[in-house]
């Protein structure tokens, strides 16, 4: 008779962070947010970063391709949870996202966010 072995969950609880409704990053731009975890995940659009935020019934997650956001949350020494603000920033003619300290003032970022929303969905044009 074969020996029966107990199942061992190798990623104990880590996926429960992502067992929630997913939103767009737009939902939390310019708001102080508690980020609870992140992981790189293979999707039909290639490898993307999934970032979880919020707690309890308010928890959610979003996918991002932003290099600035991925570099922060996927850093080997990153500790979760942490509080931060995601702001829209200008990089020359391009727009992107960046983490800021939770006490950072929200000034002209509203104008950047409005410009981002107007250009969202349009491809890069030469």
Task: Show where each model-derived region lies.
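A short macromolecule-binding patch
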Residues: 58-64
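OB-fold/S1-family single-stranded nucleic acid-binding modules
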Residues: 87-124
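OB-fold ssDNA-binding interfaces and closely related basic DNA-contact patches used
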Residues: 1-56
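Short, surface-exposed, charged amphipathic helix/loop patches that serve as local interaction elements
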Residues: 46-56, 85-93, 98
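Eukaryotic short linear interaction motifs
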Residues: 42-43, 59, 70-71, 93-95, ...
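Positively charged, low-complexity intrinsically disordered regions
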Residues: 60, 79, 119, 123-126
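Short nucleic-acid-contacting surface segments enriched for D/E, G, S/T with interspersed K/R
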Residues: 26-29, 68-87
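Exposed alpha-helical structural elements
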Residues: 3, 67-68
């Amino acid at each position: 008779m074969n020996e029966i072995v107990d199942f061992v969950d190798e990623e104990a609880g880590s996926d429960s962070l992502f067992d929630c409704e997913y939103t767009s990053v737009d939902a939390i731009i310019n708001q102080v947010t508690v980020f609870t975890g992140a992981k790189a995940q293979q999707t039909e659009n290639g490898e993307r970063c999934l970032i979880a935020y919020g707690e309890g019934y308010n928890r959610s997650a979003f996918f991002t391709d932003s290099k600035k956001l991925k570099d922060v949350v996927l850093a080997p020494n990153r500790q979760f949870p942490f509080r931060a603000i995601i702001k829209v920033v200008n990089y020359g003619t391009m727009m992107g996202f960046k983490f800021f300290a939770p006490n950072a003032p929200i000034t002209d970022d509203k104008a950047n966010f409005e410009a981002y929303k107007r250009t969202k969905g349009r491809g890069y044009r030469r």
